[in-house]
Regions:
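Extracellular "leader-to-stem" segments immediately downstream of a signal peptide or signal-anchor
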Residues: 2-276, 448-488
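Short, glycine/acidic-rich beta->alpha junctions
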Residues: 69-70, 94, 102, 157, ...
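Short, T/G/N/S-enriched strand-turn elements that build extracellular solenoid repeat scaffolds
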Residues: 74-82, 97-110, 120-123, 308-313, ...
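Extracellular beta-strand solenoid repeats
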Residues: 90, 97, 103, 111, ...
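Extracellular beta-strand/beta-solenoid scaffold signature
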Residues: 125-144, 160, 239-249, 274-288, ...
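Extracellular beta-rich repeat passengers
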Residues: 128, 266, 273-276, 299, ...
Length: 488
């Protein structure tokens, strides 16, 4: 049973100047019989969307264009700027030939003179997995908890902000924690993922024992009740799991890193090459390394890459804004499709970005990877071809918003695809999507499609609200942010 309050009918003007009729709904009232509510996506982005992206500041170093490979000169400028406390390394107008492996440290920005003026030109990706540009210096070593305490609530729904633990005395305000639970055989089986077989071979979805985590900070402690800074994006059900809170000491983070106002071109192109982990062509143009936080990529054009931006696990509070991805080659088949943006981190905000180039070059324009913790959000994403999809990729990511896009949105069971990618998303929300929508919900989860005006797959068990009619608020992200900041 779904609860939702419809208010009055409203309208707005679309970007094309057309009048869009909309149903005004109370988004806060949307919940199911278990008490699962829409996740709060207002915490996505740089500084949890509490601050604007940094403005234009004077450059610490200006590097001028010239012939030859400029990798060493640019890296030296980045290193000296970081060593002096941070600042902006500005690339003047022109073309800079570089090689993979440039790294940007904390408090340092690499800024061009505009996407039409400054181009980073690379002719070859050298080593499998070595990005052209990387942000931050962290690694994904295992984090050992300093202490843990079992959660005693029978059920904690999506959107909840409090949990009850056995021993609250151990916790304090400001403590960094993982809301954790290990995948159990009972949970895997109840979701229909225990007996996957492909070509006669058993496929494994989420291995039993693998942790599904939600990184949070304790906001308040009252007895054994903990209030968290961000509402949960995945439910906790004692029937199928043994959830607990794990406190940990935050490793050194890499904040305030930026890449902006430039183009990146790989020629000859790698776009669309058959996916192979040992193939250098699958190295990303930009990679945000673990524990990179409060950083951004904006006003960037990327051409010729198979995979463009990779946001790794334990990356958080990131904004990707006005990023354009140009596919200049058709996609090889058979083989996995390339991706524009790959999300394994949390609190990632992608806005006003899109994919261009060959309309026949099929790709996943934004994906989430295995167990990627929410919230993450994609706003106003544009694609030129209905071959492109916003498509959570594998193994129970959770808390993913897609709104106001013309792309196809797929929240569906991927079954034995890959090596058993199965249910890829829980607590996914498609809001005012104009492209095609196919939304299904896992047995122990829920995904929503609200205000869909494009073609909708009706033979599914996804939760559909106001199907065929757009809704107000036009942006769920903006409405939640205004509510949180008291400006609604």
């Amino acid at each position: 049973m779904l609860s939702v309050k419809f208010l009055v009918a409203l309208s707005w003007l679309s970007a094309a100047g057309q009048l869009v009729l909309a149903a005004d709904i109370d988004w806060e009232s949307i919940k199911n019989s278990r008490g699962d509510k829409l996740p709060d996506f207002s915490y996505c982005g740089y500084r949890s969307s509490d601050k604007s992206l940094p403005g234009s500041t004077a450059a610490s170093v200006v590097v001028k264009a010239s012939s030859g490979d400029r990798t060493k000169e640019i890296q030296a400028a980045l290193d000296s700027t970081a060593a002096s406390g941070g600042g902006v390394v500005e690339l003047a107008a022109g073309t800079f030939r570089i090689s993979p492996g440039l790294n940007i440290s904390a408090n340092t920005r690499l800024r061009g003179s505009g996407v039409e003026s400054t181009t980073l030109d690379v002719t070859k990706l050298k080593t499998a997995g070595l990005p052209l540009l990387s942000m931050g210096n962290g690694t994904n070593g295992r984090i050992k908890p300093s202490f843990t305490s079992k959660i005693t609530d029978k059920y904690v729904g999506i959107g909840a902000k409090t949990v009850t633990v056995e021993d609250g005395k151990q916790f304090a305000k400001g403590q960094t924690v993982f809301i954790s639970r290990a995948a159990t055989e009972k949970w895997v089986r109840q979701n229909g993922m225990a007996d996957l077989v492909r070509d006669g071979e058993k496929q494994t979805w989420v291995p039993v024992g693998n942790l599904i985590q939600q990184p949070r900070t304790v906001q308040a402690v009252s007895g054994n009740k903990l209030t968290l800074d961000i509402p949960l994006t995945d439910a906790l059900d004692q029937t199928y799991m043994e959830p607990y809170v794990a406190a940990y000491d935050l490793p050194e983070t890499n904040p305030e890193i930026g890449i902006e106002d430039l183009s990146i071109t790989l020629s000859p192109t790698c776009a669309g090459r058959v996916f192979n982990e040992s193939e250098p062509c699958n190295a990303p143009a930009i990679q945000l390394n673990p524990w990179t936080v409060d950083s951004f990529v904006r006003n960037v054009n990327i051409t010729g890459f198979n995979n463009c931006i990779d946001v790794q696990y334990n990356v958080s509070r990131i904004t990707i804004e006005n990023a354009s991805f140009f596919r200049d080659r058709d996609t090889d088949r058979p083989g996995g499709y390339p991706t524009d943006i790959n999300i394994s981190g949390t609190q990632v905000l992608i806005k006003d970005s899109g994919q261009y180039g060959r309309k026949t070059a099929k790709a996943f324009t934004v994906i989430t990877q295995a167990r990627a913790p929410g919230p993450n959000a994609v706003l106003r994403h544009h694609i030129q071809s209905d071959l492109q999809e916003l498509y959570p990729h594998q193994r129970w990511a959770h808390g993913f918003l897609v709104e106001n896009t013309n792309a196809n949105v797929m929240f569906v069971n991927r079954g034995t695809a890959g090596s058993g990618q199965g249910w890829p998303i829980n607590a996914g929300v498609a809001w005012n999507v104009r492209g095609g929508v196919n939304v299904s919900s896992p047995p122990l989860g829920i995904n929503w499609a609200i205000g869909s005006t494009g073609p909708v797959e009706l033979v599914s068990n996804g939760t559909l609200v106001s199907n065929g009619t757009a809704v107000t608020p036009k942006s769920l992200y903006n409405a939640q942010r205004q509510k949180r900041k008291g400006t609604a």
